[in-house]
């Protein structure tokens, strides 16, 4: 059984179009609060049937602080903290993330950035070196759906996020009380 799962994951990794991290990433424009509007089916280590997911990123001298928050299916707040960093020789959107309680670090590749408004990127598409994980973050949920959703979906298709494990899954962001976290 485990062997079959590993084969499926291996095949899925090679049927995608190759994505690359962005060459330039201004971390000061990347920090702050993000609302997660899309995830993938494969990456459910922290997420399952969730809503109102946010990511708060801050800057320190050495790292980017990470606090991911969401509501589970019962409306309970779930959070996980950690940090992102550059491995030696990496730059741009080629980061690594380490989350508390998760045994291994993981690639965090920013593969596309939206336009800059008020000194912040409007949206971000994140994946990894195998194109298995997928996250779409936005600064403003309404503006994302009104202005950027079609372009992002086109990009996701071009990047190969169309398979069973990697097909984009919308995270509900309606009736959210973000003051809980």
Task: Tell what function each PLM region has.
Residues 3-4, 9-181:
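A beta-rich soluble binding module of mature secreted/lumenal proteins
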């Amino acid at each position: 059984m485990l062997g079959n799962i590993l084969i499926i994951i291996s095949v899925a990794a090679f049927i995608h179009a190759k994505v690359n991290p962005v060459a330039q990433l201004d971390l000061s424009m990347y920090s702050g609060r993000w609302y997660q509007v899309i995830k993938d089916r494969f990456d459910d280590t922290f997420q399952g049937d969730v809503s109102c997911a946010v990511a708060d990123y801050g800057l320190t001298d050495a790292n980017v602080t990470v606090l991911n928050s969401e509501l589970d299916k019962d409306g309970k707040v779930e959070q996980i903290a950690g940090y992102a960093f550059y491995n030696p020789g990496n730059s741009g959107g080629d980061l690594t993330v380490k989350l508390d309680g998760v045994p291994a670090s993981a690639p965090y590749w920013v593969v596309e950035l939206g336009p800059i408004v008020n000194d912040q990127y409007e949206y971000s598409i994140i994946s990894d070196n195998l194109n298995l994980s997928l996250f779409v973050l936005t600064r403003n949920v309404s503006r994302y759906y009104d202005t950027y959703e079609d372009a992002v979906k086109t990009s996701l298709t071009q990047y190969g996020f169309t398979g069973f494990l990697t097909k984009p899954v919308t995270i509900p962001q309606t009736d959210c009380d973000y003051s809980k976290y």
